[in-house]
């Protein structure tokens, strides 16, 4: 790396100083202050604040910065509630599915088939399932269906999907979650939409549901299905079914927490649906 010419005026022996200091200088978007050889350098961050960092501190600073850059690579974060523009950017950068294509659409199968699928377990996927009675009657079913179509099941303080997002095969969208301080944007794509309409027979069942697969940039790899069902006994059930595994360093080390959050979401999501039926 070439030593900047303007630095020679401050220290004739500067070319023998550690290269890490030069790296740090080039990475800072601000004005250079002055050197205090041989232990520290001073520079402006922005245009106001003066910072003095020793060579050893500079090394730690760079190592920490590289570590943060590594663990946040391809994670879509926002300190404020994500705007439509941020969500669109997340979707545009997300690319393709991040889980095995042989499992695409697998959540459309009955729950029993998913739980008995040894291949899923062998490939490291864990299953999350919740089925809750939310009422009875065709009117309740229709209200539940409308709630899903308008993403009311994501109408939470800490989680949301743009309610204008159409539920159709191939549609990409973001699930926005607030985790501690930042919001995290999770890109997904609808892989199927299934609806069984009620026949003229009074006791016939009806159901509506859709499944979404995770895209690159999502902390997990897998698929999730949301559905509402009117059974033969005229009872209405809301169901969440997913299989997933960590797709990033952060979700890997915090997977027990992720699993708890999945169960918590299922509970909160059910309450959100109940408000609309």
PLM regions: where:
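Hydrophobic ligand-binding cavity/cleft-lining segments
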Residues: 2-33, 54-180
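Intrinsic disorder
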Residues: 4, 40-43, 47
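Intrinsically disordered, low-complexity segments enriched in serine/threonine/proline/glycine
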Residues: 35-38, 51
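N-terminal mitochondrial targeting presequence
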Residues: 46-49, 55
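A conserved amphipathic terminal alpha-helix motif
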Residues: 87, 246-277
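Hydrophobic-ligand binding "helix-grip"
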Residues: 180-232
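Beta-strand/loop substructures that line and gate deep hydrophobic ligand-binding cavities in soluble
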Residues: 214-260
